[in-house]
């Protein structure tokens, strides 16, 4: 009897200690923002450099394939598979971001990140060594799985390695890296394809990915490893399986519809209607599941409904949408209207890249100094909207100085927007919930970016078909325009109509940029709704809360120890 009672009390002590650990840090991420516990100097510099290299590779992989695709299709003789080369990566990347956001809250942070890097490396190796088109597509899908974990993992590592008051500067670098890689990707893809082989677009990931893995393995230290102290049965329950069953196929179905619609199949095709319907139904089901089971939800309702998280989601979704439209269709303007090659059009985006980098760094430094990120977000969204509006002024006779100026204004605005939603998530949420918040922000950017590439392309095709229909002796469908490509359209028209087609193409592109302008203006509403919270004040609150938790934990431990000692003394 004495032994049984003693066992029960020890078990109660262990259970209470488990609860205290969970409350004080959840996933073991909480250091109380005592800056002495974070890495410093060379160790921090090497860790963050390598982590950002990983982010650069993931973002690079989205667009590096754009200029390599012709060489890949020529080698595999699989022209019907072209759409899958980009879609396979996008589907798995977008579908797993929220999943990894949940995993980082209760699994070992280092092990989870390294697993994502391994998936990305395996996928890259399969792509580089692919003997046929099917193997290449499988490799792209595997790489996309890892990419979702790396993207979210970089933000989690920033939380683990850097105190809150200093994170904005690194978040600024995060935005700069993402923006630079989005533009440099096609340039590197073209360079590798022309001078070495398209396979090096993917082999290049292997040594750099290995460097990232080594740096994280040896330099990243997370209290308790970041893993929730609970059984695997409890961890599986925390995974919200029923929610994932709705989320993953829902996102995949929606992305498939958007990738195929208007390109591979018409929007009225049964496949597109089925994918759209299935995707929307499953995503609605996912939302209901989150409300129904909030304790194990992938995205707990109390997180999404928090004011800064909701407005951050709004800003990120619309930001991802309008920046994708501008980045995707501005090179088309250079190629179709100015006669640039694909590589030249990429080079002409360098003013945009430089503006993003400078603005991101300045915004990060400014936020670190003042403690407030909301004013920079408001200024950034307004400036980006002005820049998006300037693209409506583009004409065939637009001078070099003008289009450079338009890019600088727009890029400077974007640089001021990138970091605020993520910093807000890390500021208003506890450290164990921050991965879910940042994953939600990334998911919004990725999903809406994918949606509005398709929207923009369909606007361009429809507008161009309408404007060309008015030309005497010339009739063309949106499908024929899409098949002809950027410059192929001019080869389909009589020489005497080239100038008219040029102005029609320019007008259609301006209508597409108008979509970007509308989205950029709507982004301002989200920035105005963002809470004014200081990272400096929140860090102080976290330090005080961490101290209180430590005192409560010590008191609870002492209380149970006293209870056990008392029972022993009385022979219970």
Swiss-Prot record:
**Pfam families reported in the protein's UniProt record:** MFS_1
Please give the Gene3D superfamilies that the UniProt record associates with this protein.
MFS general substrate transporter like domains (1.20.1250.20)
Composition bias type Basic and acidic residues, residue spans: 539-556
Task: State whether keyword Nucleotide-binding applies.
Answer: no
The family assignment reads: Belongs to the major facilitator superfamily. TCR/Tet family.
InterPro entries linked:
MFS, MFS_dom, MFS_trans_sf
Among PROSITE patterns, the record links this protein to:
MFS
* Chief location bin: membrane
Compartment(s):
Membrane
Region annotation (Disordered) maps to 539-572
The way this protein sits in the membrane is described as: Multi-pass membrane protein
Keywords for this protein: Membrane, Transmembrane, Transmembrane helix
Question: Matching CDD domains, A to Z?
Answer: MFS_Azr1_MDR_like (cd17502)
Q: Which organism is it from?
A: Pseudocercospora fijiensis (strain CIRAD86)
Residue intervals passing through the bilayer: 45-65, 81-101, 117-137, 142-162, 172-192, 200-220, 243-263, 272-292, 313-333, 346-366, 374-394, 403-423, 436-456, 512-532
Q: What is the lineage of its organism?
A: Eukaryota, Fungi, Dikarya, Ascomycota, Pezizomycotina
| Name under which the protein is recorded | MFS-type transporter MYCFIDRAFT_190113
